[in-house]
């Protein structure tokens, strides 16, 4: 995961100060890419400990199509609390767009089901893409999608994934995003009888919040450790039937957690 640390260094050295929506301020760079070979291990950051439970439950929540944080709260996940309304609703965010995109003709589109079917039946398609950036519904979302689209690529029995992100909280958010899209790639690969190969991140406004600068510098003093492995214990009938206990991360030996505040 040295490429992640190199990105932190890049922002610290080349970032420009920008005011932002939260009032915190950022150091920002524009247009960056990271690549992870999934055959070398599961890309879970080792220079600080990540909350694996939150990563897995959030992805299962996205895939369920749910947009209320009740499920997350029941499973000890608090990462969406700051944006939900008093009933726990977030509006038509990721889960709604992935599973029930509302078209102009009134029909709903399950993008996840469709992309998996296309991978199975038309793997050379250049349309293996899911988008959460539904312009007509952005104003109804408590937080418009930061990671707004992802695309799959099939070659020689392997599956790669590239996701696009308009806004990147590099210290807190990006490590979660990397692990989440890696997990999604493993799951889709298993459902399609493929092997996971590569994960690619493409970011637009890639930034460090000003109240994360010292934490980033601390992280840069730490040496990356060997990547853990992901074990998926069973293959359910569909991607929507995975359970939390189906996943096991082994040989994860991270440096201690580094506390940092979320900018809302």
From Swiss-Prot:
Q: Known EC number(s)? A: 2.1.1.45
Q: Which domain of life is it from?
A: Bacteria
Query: Could you say which residues bind (6R)-5,10-methylene-5,6,7,8-tetrahydrofolate here?
Result: 51, 169, 263
Q: Which GO terms describe its molecular function?
A: thymidylate synthase activity
Record has Methyltransferase as a keyword: yes
Q: Name one GO biological process term.
A: dTTP biosynthetic process
User: What pathway does this protein act in?
Assistant: Pyrimidine metabolism; dTTP biosynthesis
For whether the record's keyword set contains Methyltransferase, the answer is yes
The record's section on NCBIfam families has: PRK01827.1-3, PRK01827.1-5, thym_sym
* Name of the protein in its database record: Thymidylate synthase
């Amino acid at each position: 995961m040295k490429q992640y640390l190199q990105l932190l260094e890049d922002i610290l050295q080349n970032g420009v100060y920008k005011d932002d929506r939260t009032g915190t301020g950022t150091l920002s760079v524009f247009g960056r890419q990271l690549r992870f070979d999934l055959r070398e291990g599961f890309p879970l950051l080792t220079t600080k400990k990540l909350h694996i439970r939150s990563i897995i439950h959030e992805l299962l929540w996205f895939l369920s199509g749910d947009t209320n944080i009740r499920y997350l709260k029941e499973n000890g996940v608090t990462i969406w609390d700051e944006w939900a309304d008093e009933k726990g609703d977030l509006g038509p965010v990721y889960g709604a767009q992935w599973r029930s995109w509302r078209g102009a003709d009134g029909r709903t589109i399950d993008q996840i089901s469709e992309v998996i079917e296309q991978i199975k039946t038309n793997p050379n398609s250049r349309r293996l893409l899911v988008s959460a950036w539904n312009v007509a519904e952005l104003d109804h979302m408590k937080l418009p999608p930061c990671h707004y689209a992802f695309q799959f690529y099939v070659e020689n029995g392997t599956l790669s994934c590239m996701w696009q992100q308009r806004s990147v909280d590099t210290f807190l958010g990006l490590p979660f995003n990397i692990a989440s899209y890696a997990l999604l790639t493993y799951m889709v690969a298993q459902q399609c009888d493929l092997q996971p190969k590569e994960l690619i991140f493409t970011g637009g406004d890639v930034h460090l919040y000003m109240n994360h600068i010292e934490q980033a510098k601390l992280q840069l003093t730490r040496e990356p450790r060997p990547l853990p492995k992901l074990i998926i214990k069973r293959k359910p009938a569909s991607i929507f039937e995975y359970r939390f206990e189906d996943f096991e991360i082994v040989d994860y030996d991270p440096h201690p957690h580094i506390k940092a505040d979320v900018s809302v």
